[in-house]
């Protein structure tokens, strides 16, 4: 694997290989022993958009592996403020680091960067397009908490139009056997047509709903997303749909599903849900560390000597 840009670039076997490696990384983390698996290697985190969990978990993952981190997050103090292009920025930084994690507001930015980089590029989100490392940690969470991915029933709730985590995960789940998907959203925020057409072509069972009350009782995973205000071209459209769904304690109690959320949370899950056994979103966030350790290790090892 040269880069990790989109879930469409990797198959089911490679996904399972990464998940297996992540389990080993989690076990190594639990020993509390310092690791030297990537000693002498440097990760560059290049973020053109805000991030807390993704950037910090990648930086933590690299340091846990014994590597070092350089970072570019304050665009005002970088050459980007002077008008430097993404291509030139990547060309320069790829001479400093062994691997780059990139987040950019433009769809296709990570793919473009990979064409000019001397080192592996990991896409940490390109607009509303893809977020493959979030998808891999989501799959890992499902595997760890449910015990399987094949045969699950999962409901996606909220912003399905602009939610890049949803787009990536839906595609990845379509590679597994007998997965059923439910899409709960306002009409304005339904899943993009190209993704729907892909599911139809693969004969994946899916159902579009507008109410949580329409979901079956045997759902395994409730995947909740925030309404992404920053993606709306018209603020008035955001006002129409904000707060469309709120997961309340009384709705969750007694249910068999686990609740996942890519975070940050705004108001779509009440805080008093957090202590219920179904709430797995903070554990999901933690799982990002062993998963990203596995990704960093694989990409650097796969590209050594090329």
From Swiss-Prot:
It is an enzyme of class 2 (transferase). GO terms for cellular component: cytoplasm. GO terms for biological process: 'de novo' pyrimidine nucleobase biosynthetic process; 'de novo' UMP biosynthetic process; glutamine metabolic process. Gene3D superfamilies: Aspartate/ornithine carbamoyltransferase. It comes from the Archaea. The keyword Transferase applies. The keyword Amino-acid biosynthesis does not apply. It catalyses: carbamoyl phosphate + L-aspartate = N-carbamoyl-L-aspartate + phosphate + H(+). Pathway: Pyrimidine metabolism; UMP biosynthesis via de novo pathway; (S)-dihydroorotate from bicarbonate: step 2/3. L-aspartate binds at residues 82, 164, 226. PROSITE patterns: CARBAMOYLTRANSFERASE. One of its GO terms (molecular function) is aspartate carbamoyltransferase activity. Its EC number is 2.1.3.2. Keywords: Pyrimidine biosynthesis, Transferase. Carbamoyl phosphate binds at residues 53-54, 103, 131, 134, 263-264. Belongs to the aspartate/ornithine carbamoyltransferase superfamily. ATCase family. Heterododecamer (2C3:3R2) of six catalytic PyrB chains organized as two trimers (C3), and six regulatory PyrI chains organized as three dimers (R2). Catalyzes the condensation of carbamoyl phosphate and aspartate to form carbamoyl aspartate and inorganic phosphate, the committed step in the de novo pyrimidine nucleotide biosynthesis pathway. This is Aspartate carbamoyltransferase catalytic subunit. It comes from Methanocaldococcus jannaschii (strain ATCC 43067 / DSM 2661 / JAL-1 / JCM 10045 / NBRC 100440) (Methanococcus jannaschii).
